[in-house]
UniProtKB/Swiss-Prot annotation:
InterPro entries: Cytosolic_carboxypeptidase, Pepdidase_M14_N, Peptidase_M14. This is Cytosolic carboxypeptidase 2. It catalyses: (L-glutamyl)(n+1)-gamma-L-glutamyl-L-glutamyl-[protein] + H2O = (L-glutamyl)(n)-gamma-L-glutamyl-L-glutamyl-[protein] + L-glutamate. Residues 853-866 have a biased composition (Polar residues). Its cofactor is Zn(2+). The lineage of its organism: Eukaryota, Metazoa, Chordata, Craniata, Vertebrata. It comes from Homo sapiens. Belongs to the peptidase M14 family. Metallocarboxypeptidase that mediates deglutamylation of tubulin and non-tubulin target proteins. Catalyzes the removal of polyglutamate side chains present on the gamma-carboxyl group of glutamate residues within the C-terminal tail of tubulin protein. Specifically cleaves tubulin long-side-chains, while it is not able to remove the branching point glutamate. Also catalyzes the removal of polyglutamate residues from the carboxy-terminus of non-tubulin proteins such as MYLK. It comes from the Eukaryota. One of its GO terms (molecular function) is zinc ion binding. GO terms for cellular component: centriole; ciliary basal body; cytoplasm; cytosol; microtubule cytoskeleton. Residues 396-666 form the Peptidase M14 domain.
Amino acid sequence: MFPALETHLKQTIPDPYEDFMYRHLQYYGYFKAQRGSLPNSATHQHVRKNNPQCLLNGSLGEKDDLIPDTLQKEKLLWPISLSSAVHRQIEAINRDFHSCLGWMQWRGLSSLQPPPPRFKDSPASAFRVAGITDSHMLSLPHLRSRQLLYDELDEVNPRLREPQELFSILSTKRPLQAPRWPIECEVIKENIHHIEWAPPQPEYFYQPKGNEKVPEIVGEKKGTVVYQLDSVPIEGSYFTSSRVGGKRGIVKELAVTLQGPEDNTLLFESRFESGNLQKAVRVDTYEYELTLRTDLYTNKHTQWFYFRVQNTRKDATYRFTIVNLLKPKSLYTVGMKPLLYSQLDANTRNIGWRREGNEIKYYKNNTDDGQQPFYCLTWTIQFPYDQDTCFFAHFYPYTYTDLQCYLLSVANNPIQSQFCKLQTLCRSLAGNTVYLLTITNPSQTPQEAAAKKAVVLSARVHPGESNGSWVMKGFLDFILSNSPDAQLLRDIFVFKVLPMLNPDGVIVGNYRCSLAGRDLNRHYKTILKESFPCIWYTRNMIKRLLEEREVLLYCDFHGHSRKNNIFLYGCNNNNRKYWLHERVFPLMLCKNAPDKFSFHSCNFKVQKCKEGTGRVVMWRMGILNSYTMESTFGGSTLGNKRDTHFTIEDLKSLGYHVCDTLLDFCDPDQMKFTQCLAELKELLRQEIHKKFHELGQDVDLEGSWSDISLSDIESSTSGSDSSLSDGLPVHLANIADELTQKKKMFKKKKKKSLQTRKQRNEQYQKKNLMQKLKLTEDTSEKAGFASTLQKQPTFFKNSENSSFLPMKNENPRLNETNLNRRDKDTPLDPSMATLILPKNKGRMQNKKPGFTVSCSPKRTINSSQEPAPGMKPNWPRSRYPATKRGCAAMAAYPSLHIYTYP
């Protein structure tokens, strides 16, 4: 321990780690305050658990005047925990140590010089003799370390303290971390910001009249391109690198140049955060055809749109038609309207996004180019002002910058930052931060902290489903408030919140995929950490959390494009002990928000195609209440909100209802839980009756009806089909495709040219004829060979021919088999006999008296079939090892059976 003592005696500057971090952050422009303003966050875990008041306010950019030095408090806590004997030992050590310091001052030594040798070992020896642990030594002011923490008083091995919270040394005046874009993307240097606004009156669905115009798609042939992105990463390419600001160089002006003040051409733009528009074609004075950009590095998923128009005219009726949507069904067919944002309205009247549009029609594209079918969305609109800047969107945008501004305000709040810890979970493919929030009140004891259950919430795994972010914002607003219910929830739960799982997709304006070109919500089982870091680290974090404590609930916030209202997808539990328990939370949520949430739209069937989703993977990991919350892009068909669009406030209120339902779900008085469970059983009974009635069957449910599989009763979910977005990331898939193409080309070179059926038949007949002729020739050849064997054996006495002539007529296909292995009554293959011509049969029988030619299915002995006379050849028997005494050998040919005897 003495080197540590010597080091601390030398130090006159702040902690080296903090000094290094100060210089590092100052170099990159993130910190310009005084060194003394660094917050003291080296808090002992034991102190934090027993003294919640000592929890650091890590968000302040100045020295915390509200919270005293926690290390000083920690130092005062040690005497409470130690015995009187240890107190006396520590006091003796302190006296010895201070005497050492006094001797140094008396000798005029600098604090940077070590003590003399005779005092060198004295303090450390005293500590070792007293048996004081390292953590006790840290209580001394001169031995205190801000980087080493001890969980217990008798802990020997220290641990490094956790990094300081994000934004803890930033203020709201400092710039945020700029979003990183793929290097192929051009980005305009403008800050796009929208105000939040709730319309005072309900925004009703559009009521189709039946006479809506269906414009014919004409494209560039008859129209004029007024906006088009030059460089768009398409299918076949893949993400390589990113940078702040995207593509290097000067940002080109893609919109057309106006010819004068009378030119009424609209100026389009979408090269900003979450923007998505690839091309605009002017087909008439006030009519435009729009083409959306697909998700980067794919050719799919065109649903989300968000773009800007300028140079508007107030009294004109404009028509916009999006020509390349991919989903055959949409909420636009049942009255959903697009969103409009007027910059002049926001500046002058404080009015934000609102639903606008008439003559709305969703229909199939009439173009047939042999590719996948496209669908069109057309609507008309009148802009409120001349020369206005307006935005259109599929739903209320919520960008990555919006999230960072919100988290920065939380980190700089002196109260909220005490129970909300902000960390970096990981970095995305482009290098953007994936944030993790841990929200809980400090516990009084370690036992109380360990007894807390966890709740995991996440959003924006699909970047185009911005409604998930608004629900998450409503949840955070409530759980971080000073409401008594929020304080109670923080007392009994540890909340792990992932507000944006796919920041890259949100930044570039994707609808469903990440920069890997794949749907992240199908890869929660992945092992490819480098390709899917956000999902891999999320699953790993939850896995570690399950090892520490029970996770009561997991919920992933999504958006739905084909069904109205809000509903949940869950997982049926096969454990009879917890039968129907997974449906209690959704039913409670339905009761708390009856005009928004539809329990009858919920589904709990686990499909094979959903095995890679977060909901199913977390359920497989042991989280019983694992859900996907689907909030519609449209509105409600329930209660007082029937046939009205959802607003931002409606979605944020759902976040509050989630918190309220959590309290009901965990109420010590289980009356609500029991009532919901009984109601669920009755609903299930009615559903079973309905199913059997549809099948025309009658069933008695008074018995063990609960044994009926719930998956058989429920229909499949109407969720999105992302099968095309499964599989390897794009860069690996491209490599696999290249290898497959090379294999196909290699095989193609070996293959012969294709033939017609007539040619194949002629070739087949010719081949069969050649085989028959060959079999006939083999029969004559083998018969001649057998007659040769019957001649005088002296033929083999010639040394020159003895080794050559027998091999001359030897057929390599000759197979010798032991005749004793076949029963005498077993018939030979009749098909073999038919292949021998009658004339050859007679000739062979006449020329080979020493051989028996069997062409009949049964062996018989007659005058024409006499056994061969006994003779013993004078060549060594070892020359034919397969021949044994007393055994007959059969030389088998494709069309002939010849029996020889030794």
